[in-house]
Amino acid sequence: ADWNDALDMAAEHGESVAFTCAYAGNLEELAGLLRVLAERGHREVELLEELELLLEKENRLPDFLHLCAHSVRGSKRRFDTLALADTLQAMAERLREHIRKTEWIAGENEGWFNSYYDNHQNRVEGYFPGGVRMMLTGQVFAVMSGTATPAQTSLICRAADRYLYRKEVGGYRLNTDFHEEKFDLGRMFGFAYGEKENGAVFSHMSVMYANALYRRGFIREGYKALQSLAETAMDFETSRIYPGIPEYFNADGRGLYHYLTGAASWYILTFITQVFGVRGELGGLVIEPKLVREQFDGEGAAQISLHFAGKAYEITLQNPQRLDYGAYKIVSASCNGEPMQTDGVRVRVPAQDATENCILLTLGGRL
């Protein structure tokens, strides 16, 4: 099992392409952080000496697992920061290229990545005699990690809209109907299609899909995923729930298990860090708005209040021309009345002494 703990019957020979994508993304992110450390004068980093096995070109994972099965010695050694960054970056690129070459499922004006291998070592997804088999999880991690190229991401969106999207039940289903009890992969196939992990609109993964799309610049597509969840949750006649994000919407669009989901926190995280674009970056506060026209009020404004590094911020975006994302840029920015520099896309907010701060960003046309 990876994110989907109902894929639990392929322990001997199964593989998670989805999480391999995630590993590639993590390796690249670590490489980037190491380069920042090097730029700031940290020429070496100290790590547990057992980790050196994982940096060798040969497959030493079994040796590493055996060595660390019960404990680590606690001894450390120093590694050259830039050399380590280059090693991790190369590992990330090898994983990505391998997945792009071996796991891409090409269709006519559509495509997606295979997410898993079953316990018989067979690819799970693709075009089958009994119908198309597609799972959302592999697409989320491929897009989020940068494994999917921009062109592939566009094709994934087309395939997801065609095979997984059902607006009337909340948006993007977790998978298509496999029409079998596939117990060489997981117990999820014991559920009726549209229930739980077998083809329900699983809110957590839908929000992660939106988050991934926003990160990669597919703003309208990300908005569609978020808005579909919200509209279904707010439609009592369909969802039969009080307003909120449930674990999943079933085949009838009914929301279930409010208390058993990480989707709510991911939804808030995505809205703050991607939609409003307010996030921490290497210790500083950055604002990179990605709101679409519909998300501004009747006066062309959008506002968010939050805390960052112990300080309170009220951030207002003014869009007087009611421009859509892609048509606007940041034309001016200020904090507590003091102008801030912007490149038109984002603003890096200088550290503030005040405990309460007001930020105003004005958006205008790109031309």
Q: What is the meaning of each model-derived region?
A:
Residues 1-367:
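Acidic, mature catalytic/reactive cores of soluble proteins
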